[in-house]
Amino acid sequence: MQIQFHLYNTLTRTKELFRPQDQANVKMYVCGPTVYDNPHIGNSRSAAVYDLLYRILIKIFGSTAVKYIRNITDVDDKIIDRAELLGSTINELTDKVTQEFHINMEYLGCKLPSIEPKATEHIDIMIEIIERLIAKKHAYIADKHVYFNVLSAPNYTELSNRNLEEMFEGVRVENSKTKKHPQDFVLWKPAKPNESANMNFDSPWGLGRPGWHIECSAMSYKYLGENFDIHGGGADLIFPHHTNEIAQSRCAFPSSTYAKYWVHHGFLTVNGEKMSKSLGNFITVRDLMDKEISGEVIRLFLLSSHYRRPLDYNDKAIEDAKKTLDYWYRAIVNINLQKIDIIPNDFMQSLLDDMNTPLAVKIINDYARGVFTSTTEEEKKFNASNLITCANFIGLMNKTPHEWFNSGVNELYINELVNKRLEAKKQKNWLLADQIRNQLLEQQIVLEDKPDGTIWRKG
């Protein structure tokens, strides 16, 4: 039976049955980071959401049939400003931040995309598309800039579902006397005096660099062609970025529909407020790594809410994710797991229904509970195997219980204290034994006395 996968399409504002143009060549493009500063947890939500989508597509169509492109924006005004502030070269900054991004992705258990193109390596294609737009009267040259003529684009407001005036309310628009219309956006901008040569390129319109929107149109065209299946990104990109992508790509290639399914994830806040450096609540993945918050805890937190809903980062949410994973890992302690290749149907159906991760997590939790309430060894193994299979599918429970409960602790030091306590008990020195137990408890190390000795775990 054909697997049916439904996704909410921002373009049509309906949940649709996903039908790729070619089941042997499923194409997905996702907007990646602008590498000017360390990735924040908002970037991580995007990574986790589309990593899960990638896993689902692979499950349905096979790993060789799915092409996942996630770009790196390494040419941008923010990069220039940041490099000047740090006294760094452009390349030093972008290389360092890109490396940090990759470290973060590995920490969160995200699969590598099929291709991760850099904007600076595709300037020629951007120029090619801009020339097509000029030739078709959808773009014009003014004062060494090249602008896209928004009013020339059919159905410009289709993705945002708002009229033109509403779309630009509250949006910063670059004012220029050389523009034909205030809403027109830049495709190519000239180099500024004394600006870094690393951020500017030769073009038919002089030395300069591309606008942000043309970068994604060029890279998606290079690797996926005029038409592809899925385009992903945050809801904040619907306008202007994705709206402008659609306009310029469809105008450059008139027979193109560009992306068929537009999949957007919701906003991420911190303690109920928008994340910003001015509010002092700007949290990077590196901040969480330095606090020794497990990548699996962060990933479960990111997937705990439906991807289209807002998600709030707070200490309780992280603590809840940690407790949930502790519960799951505790369920498989001392169980000889049976490897199963079949994913339980109820779990898979939850993900096939617009990636309903809250329901998927509930189902995993039910399997964990089933382990503890099982009355037979066979039933216990069944629940434990389904637990680990489902959790693995969404990128969780990739450690043994021992690794999980003892991560980030000095095992030699703890074993010495456990042996010292054991000796104290033999000497009937109950006061010292209790002191050692309490000392370890303060370090979140829990002792369990068994007939054959004492075992410990991180609480």
UniProtKB/Swiss-Prot annotation:
Highest rank taxon of the organism: Bacteria
Record flagged with keyword Nucleotide-binding: yes
GO BP terms, alphabetized: cysteinyl-tRNA aminoacylation
Binding-site residues for Zn(2+), renumbered to this chain: C31, C216, H241, E245
Residues involved in ATP binding: K277
Motif ('KMSKS' region): 274-278
Catalysed reaction equations from the record: tRNA(Cys) + L-cysteine + ATP = L-cysteinyl-tRNA(Cys) + AMP + diphosphate
UniProt GO molecular function: ATP binding; cysteine-tRNA ligase activity; zinc ion binding
Cofactor (UniProt): Zn(2+)
Record-level GO cellular component terms: cytosol
Entry's localization field: Cytoplasm
Note describing how the cofactor binds: Binds 1 zinc ion per subunit.
UniProt keyword list: Aminoacyl-tRNA synthetase, ATP-binding, Cytoplasm, Ligase, Metal-binding, Nucleotide-binding, Protein biosynthesis, Zinc
Motif stretch ('HIGH' region): 33-43
EC nos: 6.1.1.16
Transmembrane segments: none
SUPFAM superfamilies referenced in this protein's UniProt entry, alphabetically: Anticodon-binding domain of a subclass of class I aminoacyl-tRNA synthetases, Nucleotidylyl transferase
SMART domains per UniProt: DALR_2
Subunit-level organization: Monomer.
Family: Belongs to the class-I aminoacyl-tRNA synthetase family.
Record-given protein name: Cysteine--tRNA ligase
UniProt lineage: Bacteria, Pseudomonadati, Pseudomonadota, Alphaproteobacteria, Rickettsiales
